[in-house]
Swiss-Prot record:
InterPro entries: aa-tRNA-synth_II/BPL/LPL, Ala-tRNA-lgiase_IIc, Ala-tRNA-ligase_IIc_anticod-bd, Ala-tRNA-synth_IIc_core, Ala-tRNA-synth_IIc_N, Ala-tRNA_ligase, Ala_tRNA_ligase_euk/bac, DHHA1_dom. It is found in: Cytoplasm. It comes from Sorangium cellulosum (strain So ce56) (Polyangium cellulosum (strain So ce56)). Its cofactor is Zn(2+). GO terms for cellular component: cytosol. GO terms for molecular function: alanine-tRNA ligase activity; aminoacyl-tRNA deacylase activity; ATP binding; tRNA binding; zinc ion binding. This is Alanine--tRNA ligase. The keyword Transferase does not apply. Zn(2+) binds at residues 592, 596, 694, 698. It is an enzyme of class 6 (ligase). Its EC number is 6.1.1.7. PANTHER family: ALANINE--TRNA LIGASE, CYTOPLASMIC (PTHR11777:SF9), ALANYL-TRNA SYNTHETASE (PTHR11777). SUPFAM superfamilies: Class II aaRS and biotin synthetases, Putative anticodon-binding domain of alanyl-tRNA synthetase (AlaRS), ThrRS/AlaRS common domain, Translation proteins. Belongs to the class-II aminoacyl-tRNA synthetase family.
Length: 917
C-alpha cells in the first residue's frame, strides 16, 4: 500500500504512526517541550529524550517497542542554528520528529527493513533518489560492516550508494558515559538528476541537493566511565528520528521546508501583514517572512506550556526568539503589533493535533502581544542609540562596537545582544561579542549552565538487582506492614562543607548508630515523587529500631527507607515491621488533596492558563506554583479560598481508579505537563470538576481537609506565581497567630475595636510628615555646610570647588556630612550637577550608620560618553558593596565605611578609564 502524493503533513504523521503500530509498537504521545526531570537540557530536542531513562536502565516501560511524533526545539547548546533559520531551506527552531524505538527488542535488521519499507513502499519514494551512510570505523570504534551488509541485502545497493562516513557523522553518544553506537542515515536528493558525486556538498539555498531525512541509531555499546573501554550492551536498542518537515518537503514536491503545508501558511500570513509579496527566494524580505513563521510557531508552543518571556533560562530563550521575530517584522515595515496574529494562525493550523494550543489560545495571544508592545519601545530606543554610535564610529574609523556599549544596551535597555549583532552587521560593523558576554555575565544577567543530573549510585543498582520485581507499595490501603529486608545500604559522609558527599555500599548487617537505606520487598512507606515528600516512621524487628527520616525512589522499581539504626542490629533476610508516622501521613494527605482543589479554584478564578508548574506537599507545607503573569489581588485570593472551602464543606468522597491513559483523558482527567505518566495511570476524582492524575496519598473525603487558608502569594520566576497554604490544625494555628499579632498591634497603636486601620493610618501619615521635615532640615544643613565634612559654611556654591575637567567633562567628587540619607544625597548631587552645567558628572558619598552610601549624577550630554550605572560598580566594590542605575543616575551602598574616601576619589580615575575605552 502506498499513499497518494502530494500528501498532507497530517496524513504523513498518521501514516508513520499507523505503520509502526501495525508492527507492534506502542504509540506514545509527544512529551512536553520542557524536559521532565532532566536538567541537562533546555528543551526536548529529539524523540529519544523522553525514553532516555529507559535506554540507561533507570526506568522500565510495559512495552519494548515504541513510536512517536515528538515536538522539538533546537535553539541552544550544540544544536543551535538560530542564525540559519529563514536563511536556508532546512533550518527551524521548532520541528516535529517522527521516531521508532526498540528497548532491547529488535535491532539493525528490522530497523533497516522497517525504514526502507516505509519510505519506498508506503511513502513511494524512488530508491534512485536515496543513498545511505554507515560508520566507517575510526576513533577506536569498529566499522559497522553489519549494517552495510543488511543495507545491501534490503536495498540491492552497491558500495557506491552505501557511503562510509566518520565519527562526527555516523557515531552517536548520549554523553561522556552511557549507551552509544554507530548510526545510519538515509539521504534524499532534491533536484532533477540525483548525483552521488555531489553528496558531500551542502544543499543550495533553494534546498536542491542531498539532505538527510532519517537517522537510525544502533545503541550497541556502553561506556561506563569517560574515555573508558566500550562494552557491548546485553540488549542492544534502536533510536531513530525523521523530521516531519523534511519528509513533507519530499512528498509534497517542494525543496524548502517553508513551502510545506506545515509552514507555508504562516509565511503567507507574515507576507499578508507586511503588505509585501513572498517570492520564496533569498531576498531579505523573504528571509524575514520565514523567520517570523518559524519563531511564531516556537513562541506559541512554549507559551502553551507555561513558558513566559523573561530574563532567565528558558524564558530568556523565548524572549530572544520573539524579539528576533518582531525585529524582522520591523524590517518588513510592519509598524504595529503583529506577532500575536501569526501565533494565532499557528493555533488555527495545529490546534487539532496539539490541543494545548487551542486550550491556551487567549494566553498565547495576550503574551505575544504584550511582549511586542514592550519590545517596540525598546527597539526604537536601541536603534536610536546604535545609529548615533555608528555615526561616531564612522567619524573615528572604528569597525567594532565596543563590548561595554553592546552590554549596556542589554543590561540597561533589555536590547538582545544577538540583535545588536544583526543590526551592526547590516551597517557593516562588528561587535565585541565575547567581551559583551563577559560583562553581562559579571552583571548577573547571563543564564548559567544547567547542571546535569547525578548518575545512579552503583550501590542502588546492586540493590535493585537483588529484587526479583519492583518494590510493591501497600500504603494506599495500609500504614503498617511486615516484609523481608532484601538489601541494606550503609551511608557514610566523606568530606566537609561543599565537598561533602554520600558514599554508599551494600552491607549484610547494620549496627546501632549506622546511617542506612533499607530495601524491602513491599512497603507502606510512600517514596517521594510527584511533589509529595517521602514518608517518615519506624522499621522494627527483634529489639532493633530504625528511625526512618525519609523515603526515596533513586531508581525505577527501587524504594529506600533512609534513616539511622537507634537500637539493636538489622540483617539482610530478616523480617521487619514497617510503620508510617500516622500524624505526618494524615497531614500530608490533607495538604495533597487540597492542592488539587486549589488547582481547580485557580483556573476558575484566574482562567485556564493558571496551570500547575510545580508543587511540594508534606505534613507542614503546601506549596503550589502556577502560571500567571501578575500578583493576585486580595479579592482573588479570598475567592480562591472560598471556592476551596466550599468544596471541603461538601465532604465529597475522594475516589481513585487505575485506568489506561487514553481513557483517563477521555473522562476529563487533568494531566500536568511536567509530570511523567505511564500507559496506565491513577485517576483521582474529588468532584465532577476536580479530576486529575496523581500517584500520591490523599484524604478519604474532602471534609478531612478541615480548613484551607492561603498564607502567602508571590512570584518565584518569570510568569510563575507561588501560593503557600495551610490545612486542618495548621490552618487553625495560622489563624490564631494572625489574631495574636492583631492584638499586639492594637495594644501598640492604642486602638479599640475596629479602629486599628485608622490608627495605623494616622501614625504612618505623621511619620511621613516628620520625614519631610527631617529631609528639609538636612537639605538646609547640607547646602550651608560647604565642603568640609563637619560643616563650616560656604553653601552649595563652595562645594563646586575642586571640580576637574576630564576630557571635556566637569567631574566633582565630594563627601558630605555623615548621616545624610540616600534621598538627600541624591537630591544634592542633582543640584550640584545642574550648577556645574552641561557635560558634568557628580559623585557624593556619606556614612550612614555602619553603611557607606554613594550617589552619581550625570548630565544628559555626559551620558553620550559615560554611564552612571557603569561608573558606580567598581567604586561600590571599594566599600565592599554593589550598585547600579540608569545612564544618568546611579546609587550604591557598602559595608566598608573606612574606604569611603578612597571610593569617592576613585570617580576621577573611573571617568578617565571610561573615556579612554
Amino acid at each position: 500500500m502506498s499513499i497518494a502524493t502530494p500528501a498532507s503533513s497530517d496524513l504523513l504523521r498518521r501514516t508513520f504512526l499507523e505503520f509502526f503500530a501495525q508492527r507492534g509498537h506502542e504509540i506514545v504521545p509527544s512529551a512536553p517541550l520542557v524536559p521532565q526531570n532532566d536538567p541537562t537540557l533546555m528543551f526536548v530536542n529529539a524523540g529519544m529524550v523522553q525514553f532516555k531513562d529507559v535506554f540507561t536502565g533507570k526506568d522500565r516501560r510495559p512495552y519494548q517497542r515504541a513510536a512517536s511524533s515528538q515536538k522539538c526545539i533546537r535553539i541552544s547548546g550544540k544544536h543551535n542554528d538560530l542564525e540559519n533559520v529563514g536563511v536556508t531551506a532546512r533550518h527551524q527552531t521548532f520541528f516535529e520528529m517522527l521516531g521508532n524505538f526498540s528497548f532491547g527488542d529488535y535491532f539493525k535488521e528490522d530497523a533497516i527493513a522497517f525504514a526502507w519499507e516505509l519510505l519506498t513502499k508506503v511513502y513511494d519514494i524512488s530508491p534512485s533518489r536515496l543513498v545511505v551512510t554507515i560508520y566507517n570505523g575510526e576513533g577506536g570504534f569498529p566499522a559497522d560492516d553489519e549494517a552495510a551488509a543488511i543495507w545491501r541485502k534490503v536495498t540491492g545497493f552497491g558500495d557506491d550508494r552505501i557511503l562510509r562516513l566518520g565519527l562526527a557523522d555516523n557515531f552517536w553518544t548520549m554523553g561522556d558515559v552511557g549507551p552509544c553506537g554507530p548510526c545510519s542515515e538515509i539521504h534524499f536528493f532534491h533536484g532533477k538528476e540525483p548525483d552521488v558525486a555531489r553528496f558531500g556538498e551542502e544543499p543550495r539555498i533553494d534546498g536542491t541537493g542531498w539532505t538527510e531525512i532519517w537517522n537510525n541509531v544502533f545503541m550497541q555499546y556502553e561506556r561506563a566511565e569517560k574515555d573508558g573501554p566500550l562494552v557491548p550492551l546485553p540488549a542492544p536498542s534502536i533510536d531513530t528520528g525523521m523530521g516531519l518537515e523534511r519528509l513533507a518537503s519530499v512528498l509534497q514536491g517542494v525543496t524548502s521546508n517553508y513551502d510545506t503545508d506545515l509552514l507555508r501558511g504562516l509565511v503567507d500570513k507574515a507576507a499578508e501583514l507586511s503588505g509585501k509579496p513572498y517570492s520564496g527566494g533569498s531576498a531579505d524580505d523573504d528571509v524575514s517572512m520565514r523567520v517570523i513563521a518559524d519563531h511564531a510557531r516556537t513562541a506559541a508552543f512554549l507559551i502553551a506550556e507555561g513558558v513566559m518571556p523573561e530574563k532567565q533560562r528558558r524564558e530568556y530563550v523565548l524572549r530572544r526568539v520573539m524579539r528576533r521575530a518582531i525585529r524582522h517584522g520591523h524590517r518588513l515595515g510592519i509598524d504595529r503589533p503583529f506577532l500575536h496574529e501569526v501565533a494565532l494562525e499557528v493555533v488555527r493550523r495545529m490546534g487539532e493535533t496539539y490541543p494545548e494550543l487551542r486550550d491556551r489560545r487567549e494566553l498565547i495571544a495576550r503574551v505575544t502581544e504584550d511582549e511586542e508592545v514592550r519590545f517596540r519601545s525598546t527597539l526604537k530606543r536601541g536603534m536610536k542609540i546604535l545609529d548615533e554610535r555608528f555615526d561616531e564610529m564612522r567619524s573615528s574609523g572604528e569597525r567594532t562596537l565596543p563590548a561595554a556599549a553592546a552590554a549596556d544596551l542589554y543590561t540597561t535597555y533589555g536590547f538582545p545582544l544577538d540583535l545588536t549583532q544583526v543590526i551592526s552587521a547590516e551597517s557593516n560593523f562588528d561587535v565585541d561579542v565575547q567581551g559583551a558576554e563577559a560583562i553581562i555575565k559579571g552583571a548577573g544577567e547571563a543564564d548559567g549552565p544547567i547542571d546535569p543530573t547525578a548518575a545512579v549510585d552503583p550501590a542502588h543498582r546492586e540493590a535493585r538487582a537483588k529484587l526479583a520485581q519492583p518494590v510493591v507499595f501497600t500504603g494506599y490501603e495500609h500504614e503498617e506492614g511486615d516484609s523481608e529486608i532484601v538489601a541494606i545500604v550503609r551511608v557514610e559522609i566523606q568530606g566537609e562543607g561543599d565537598r561533602a558527599r554520600k558514599v554508599r555500599a551494600l552491607v549484610e548487617r547494620a549496627e546501632a548508630g549506622a546511617a542506612v537505606e533499607i530495601v524491602v520487598r513491599e512497603t507502606p512507606f510512600y517514596a517521594e515523587s510527584g511533589g509529595q515528600v517521602g514518608d517518615v516512621g519506624e522499621v522494627t524487628a527483634d529489639g532493633a529500631r530504625v528511625e526512618v527520616k525519609d523515603t526515596q525512589k533513586p531508581l525505577a522499581g527501587l524504594v529506600v527507607h533512609e534513616g539511622v539504626v537507634h537500637e539493636g542490629a538489622l540483617a539482610v533476610g530478616q523480617r521487619v515491621h514497617l510503620a508510617v508516622d500516622h500524624a505526618a501521613r494524615s497531614a500530608t494527605r490533607r495538604n495533597h488533596s487540597a492542592t488539587h482543589v486549589l488547582h481547580w479554584a485557580l483556573r476558575k478564578v484566574l482562567g485556564e492558563h493558571a496551570q500547575q508548574k510545580g508543587s511540594r506537599v508534606g505534613p507542614d507545607v503546601l506549596r503550589f506554583d502556577f502560571t500567571h503573569n501578575r500578583p493576585l489581588t486580595r479579592e482573588e485570593i479570598s475567592r480562591i479560598e472560598d471556592l476551596v472551602n466550599e468544596k471541603v464543606l461538601t465532604n465529597a468522597k475522594v475516589t481513585t481508579e487505575i485506568l489506561a491513559m487514553d481513557e483517563a483523558r477521555r473522562r476529563g482527567a487533568m494531566a500536568i505537563f511536567e509530570e511523567k505518566y505511564g500507559d496506565t495511570v491513577r485517576m483521582l476524582t474529588m468532584t465532577p470538576e476536580v479530576v486529575e492524575l496523581c500517584g500520591g496519598t490523599h484524604a478519604c473525603a474532602l471534609g478531612d481537609i478541615g480548613l484551607f487558608k492561603i498564607t502567602s502569594e508571590g512570584g518565584v520566576a518569570a510568569g510563575v506565581r507561588r501560593i503557600l497554604a495551610s490545612t486542618g490544625l495548621n490552618a487553625l494555628a495560622y489563624a490564631r497567630g494572625v489574631e495574636a499579632e492583631l492584638a499586639r498591634a492594637r495594644q501598640v497603636a492604642k486602638a479599640q475595636g475596629g479602629d486599628l486601620a485608622e490608627k495605623i493610618g494616622k501614625i504612618v501619615a505623621h511619620e511621613r510628615e516628620l520625614e519631610k521635615k527631617v529631609a528639609e532640615l538636612e537639605r538646609r544643613i547640607l547646602e550651608g555646610a560647604g565642603p568640609a565634612q563637619g560643616g563650616g559654611g560656604g553653601g552649595i556654591d563652595a562645594m563646586l570647588d575642586g571640580a576637574r575637567d576630564i576630557g571635556g567633562i566637569k567631574v566633582l567628587a565630594r563627601r558630605v556630612p555623615d548621616g545624610t540619607n540616600p534621598g538627600a544625597l541624591r537630591d544634592l548631587a542633582e543640584k550640584l550637577r545642574d550648577k556645574l552645567g552641561d557635560r558634568s558628572a557628580v559623585l557624593l558619598g556619606a556614612a550612614v550608620g555602619d553603611k557607606a552610601q554613594l550617589a552619581v549624577m550625570l548630565s544628559k550630554s555626559a551620558t553620550e560618553r559615560l554611564k552612571a550605572g557603569e561608573l558606580i560598580k567598581p567604586i561600590a566594590r571599594i566599600v565592599g558593596g554593589s550598585g547600579g542605575g540608569r545612564p544618568d543616575m546611579a546609587q550604591a551602598g557598602g559595608t566598608d565605611v573606612a574606604q569611603l574616601d578612597a571610593a569617592i576619589a576613585a570617580l576621577y580615575t573611573e571617568v578617565e578609564r571610561a573615556l579612554a575605552s
